[in-house]
Amino acid sequence: MPLSVDCYLRMSLVRIVSATCCLIGTTCLAAQPGTTAWRDGSFHIERKGIVERSDVILQKPNLLPQQAMPLGNGRLGLAVWAENGYTAQLNRGDTFPLRLSPGQVNIPSLKRLTDAPDYGARLNVYNGEFEEHGGGMTATTYVAEALDVMIIDVTGADPKILQSAELTLWSPRQPKALVNGNSGALAETWLDDKEAGASGETFGSLAAITADGNDLHAEKTSALTVKITFHSHIDGSFRILVGSPTWRGGDALASASTLLVAAAKLSTEEHRTWWHHFWERPGLMKLSSADHAAEYLENLRTIDLFTAAAESRDKLPGSQAGIGDLFSSIRDSHKWGPSAYWHWNLRMQVSANLGAGLPELNDSYFALYRQNLPNILAWTKLHMAGRPGICVPETMRFNGRGYENETWITEAALNCAGDSKPYYNARTISTGAEVSLWVWQQYLFTGDRKFLAQNYPILRESAQFLLAYATHTPDGGLHTFPSNAHESKWDVHDPTTDISAMHALFPAVIEAATILKIDPGLAAELKKELAHLPVLPRINLASPNVLTVANDDSAGTVIAASYDPAAETHNSENLGLEPVWPYGLIGDGGPLHAIAVRTFMARPNKNDNDWSADPVQAARLGLTAEFKSSLLALTERYQTYPSGLASFMGSEFYVEQAGVLADALQTALVQDYDGLVRIAPAWPKDWDADATVAIEHNGRVNLQLRKGDIITLGIDAGSADAIRIRNPWPGMRVEIVDARTNHPVVSATDGPVIGLKPVVGHSYLVRRAVAEGQPLEFKAVSGTPAFLPKSLGSRAIGIR
C-alpha cells in the first residue's frame, strides 16, 4: 500500500545532506518541520492577500506627472496624480495615428484631501483602484469594466462648498467644446492622411464629463475646456464620471449622453468583480529573501500582470515601443512614432503572459498581425521584388505598412524593403518567424486548435517568404543576403537571427500543417531545406572580426551576429543570444550549451537597455548567479517611477522592463518551451518562493522552494497530453502520485526524464520515492496588504 500523501510532505530549511531525507513534492527533516500549501489534491493560495502584498503605497501626494498611478480597463487608460488637487489624463490606444489623448480632468476642490497632513494613498491592484484619503475625505478612482468611463467616488466633502471639475485639452488640439446643461464634452476628429503609409481613415477622440451631486451645471469656459460645478450630497459624497469611447465622428453630445446615463447605473461592485475574477486566473508568486529584494521583484511582477490587464484588451495592443501608452501623463508627447509597433518591444510581454497563464492578454498582439495579413502580403510584394509570402515589418504601422514615421528623421524609414537604403530594420526579415513562433507557443500552451487555424496563415506566409528570399549556394546551402541582423548589423550574410528563425520556424510549420492537415507540399519542402540551413556563425574573442571554422568549440569561441563579423554595429543588442531566447534552440544542456554560456558571459551589452533579455537568457542557460545579478541590475537602472514602471528614452512610462522581469522570474522557476518541464533551473538558493507557473497543454506547476530545496511540487493537468519532466533531483528515485487518491501513476525511477500521462483535470505530486520524518503541517500561501513603500537600492515602489 502506498504511503499517504501527508507522509511525504516535508520541508527542509537547510541543505539536504543525506539521501535518507525524503520528499514528495516536499523535502523533509524531522528536526526542522515546516509547512506545505498542498492539501486535498490541490495547491492552496489566498489570492487576495498575495495580490495585495503588491499594492503601491503613497505616504505623500504624487504631485508630479511622473509620479502618476496607472489604471485601465484594457481599452481606456488613466494616469492619476495630485497636481492642483487632482489631475488625471485619459488615454486610448485607438486614437491613431498620433495616439492623441482625449483630455485631462482636474478637480481643484480635492486640494483639501491632497494637502492634508494625514494624506495617504494606495494603488489597490486587487480592486483595480487608486484610493486616496486625507483631511476627512476619501477619493477612489477606477475605470469601469463594462463601459469606457472613469469614475471618481468622493466622500467627506462639505455640502456647503461648491465643487468643480474641468475637462481640458491643449493647443494645437482643435476640439468642439459642447455642453447640454448637466454634462460637457470635448470631441475631435481627424484624418490619417499625412504620414507615410497613411490609411486615409477617420479617427478621433471624445471625452464627456458629468457628476452625481446636487445643483449640477455644465459650461464651456474656453475652446479647449468644459467645466462642471455642483454641491456634494448632504452626506458629503459625490461621483464624477468621465466617459471616453472609441470615436470616429457623429453626434458627440448624444453619444456622450447615452454613455454617461448608462455609466450612472454601474455599481462599484461590478468593476471590482471583474478584477477579482481576473486575479483568480494567473499563476501568482510569493517571493522572499533576507534583503527583501525578492519581495520587491514580486511586487513588480504583480504590477506587470495588473498593467497588462489594464492596457491589453482592445482590438490592437495598448503598448507600442515598449511604452505604456494608456498610462501617459504627458499630454500628446511621444518619443517614438506612435502610429507604429516595434515587435522587439512586444515579445517579452507576450512571453510573460504565457508563463503567467494569461494567454488571452495576447489576443490583441496576434490580431495586429492576423488582421493586417493582406496588407503585409501587399507590402512584401511591392517592396520585396514581388516575392511570395510575408516579410513582417519589424516596425509596422497599425495598418500593416512598414513605415517608421519619426519627428527626428527627415524621411520615413522603410522596413522589410529591398528598395530601401541600408537602415535599422530595412532588411530585418526574421520578424515574421518570431510572430509565427509566438503563435505556435500560444497553441502549445493552450491547445486551442481554432486559434492555430486562424493564425496558421502567418506561419505559412512567413515560411514561404524566407524560402523565396534565401538562395542556394552550389553546395546546396540555404543562405540569406542582404539581410539585417536585426538593428545591429545591416545587409550582412546569414544573420544569426535569420538562421535561428529558420531552424525554429520550419519544424513548427511542419507540425502545425500536419495537425491542421493542410499544405503537405510546403511541409515537405521545409523538411528538405532544414538539412541545408547554415550553422550558427562563430568567432574567437581574440579575433572578433574573423569567422572561425564551423562548429569550433574551443575556448574563447562565441556565437557571432552574422557571417560578416567585421560589419559595423548600429545598435546595442546581444544577437548571439537570440538562439537561446526567443528562438529556444539552446537551453541549459546540449552540444551548444557551452558556447552559448561563453557568448552570454562575453556579450557586448551587459544589462543595457530596459528591454534587455539578459535575465531571461541567463535563466534559459541555467546561469543562476547571472539571472539574479542581471535582473537586479536592470531593475535598479531603469525602474525609476513610483508606480513600478520604468524610464528609458523620453518621459513616458515603459512597461517592457517589467515584462522582461516577469518573464525572467517565471523562466527561472519553471521552463517548458520545448516540451521538457524543468523545475527551478536557475532559481537562487537565497530566494524562497511559493509560485504557480503555466506550462504547455494548459498545465500548471505549483512549486514551493526554501533555501534551494523543493518543498512542494505539484502539477495540474489541463489536458491529456503527455508531460515530460526533468528529474528535479538528478540521480535520485522519484515517483508521481495522483494527488487525491495517492495512487502511484509513475513508479519510482532515477532516470533523467520522467514521463507522465495525465488525466484532464487531475493534479499530481512529484516526490522522492523514500519518505522519512514527520508529516508537514498544512498552511496555505497567504499574504497581507502592503502598508509601506518598498525600496531596492536607490529605487522605490511608492512614495515615502
Locate each region found by the language model.
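Solvent-exposed beta-hairpin/edge-strand motifs
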Residues: 725-741
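Acidic/polar, glycine-enriched structural segments that form the non-catalytic walls/loops
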Residues: 32-66, 71-339, 359-363, 369-381, ...
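Active-site core of glycosidic bond-cleaving carbohydrate-active enzymes
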Residues: 342-378, 385-393, 398, 414-417, ...
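Acidic/His metal-coordination segments adjacent to aromatic residues that form catalytic metal sites
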Residues: 324-336, 396-425, 480-495, 563, ...
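Short, well-ordered beta-strand segments enriched in hydrophobic/aromatic residues
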Residues: 150-156, 502, 701-703, 710-717
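Acidic/histidine-rich catalytic neighborhood
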Residues: 461, 465-515
